[in-house]
């Protein structure tokens, strides 16, 4: 299967798929023409791996973390804990921002300077 078909099948962009190859998250077979251009041939396994990687990325696993899990499933314990901690911190940060924003009158029009001043007071 060619890269365009994989994009359509997975919903991933060409760039995302190529990055997964560059980062050695997947290793599809390929042929190289005389100009050095690679023509990839993706297997069903490659597509499954891309879909799995996409799910992990949606939950903010980094490419380095995904590589570690690919190479050693035991690392998933620590990595999952790290992702949970990061997500909890993101939620806390968002709640703090919402609390500050809730204190500002949204019925009034503000300039950028006025809005920045109001936000910096909180």
PLM ranges: what are they?
Residues 2-8, 41-122:
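Arg/Lys-rich, alpha-helical DNA-contact motif
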Residues 16-36:
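Major-groove DNA-recognition helix of helix-turn-helix-type DNA-binding domains
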Residues 2, 15-16, 32, 51:
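Homeobox/homeodomain signature
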């Amino acid at each position: 299967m060619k890269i365009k078909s994989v994009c359509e099948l997975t919903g991933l962009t060409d760039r995302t798929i190529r990055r997964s190859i560059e980062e050695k998250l997947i290793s599809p077979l390929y042929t190289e023409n005389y100009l050095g251009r690679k023509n990839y041939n993706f297997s069903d396994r490659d597509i499954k791996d891309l879909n799995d990687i996409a799910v992990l990325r949606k939950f903010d696993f980094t490419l380095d973390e995904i590589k570690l899990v690919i190479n050693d499933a035991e690392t998933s314990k620590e990595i999952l804990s790290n992702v949970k901690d990061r997500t909890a911190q993101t939620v806390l940060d968002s709640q703090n921002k919402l609390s500050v924003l809730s204190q500002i009158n949204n019925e009034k029009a503000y300039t950028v300077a006025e809005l920045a001043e109001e936000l910096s007071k909180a």
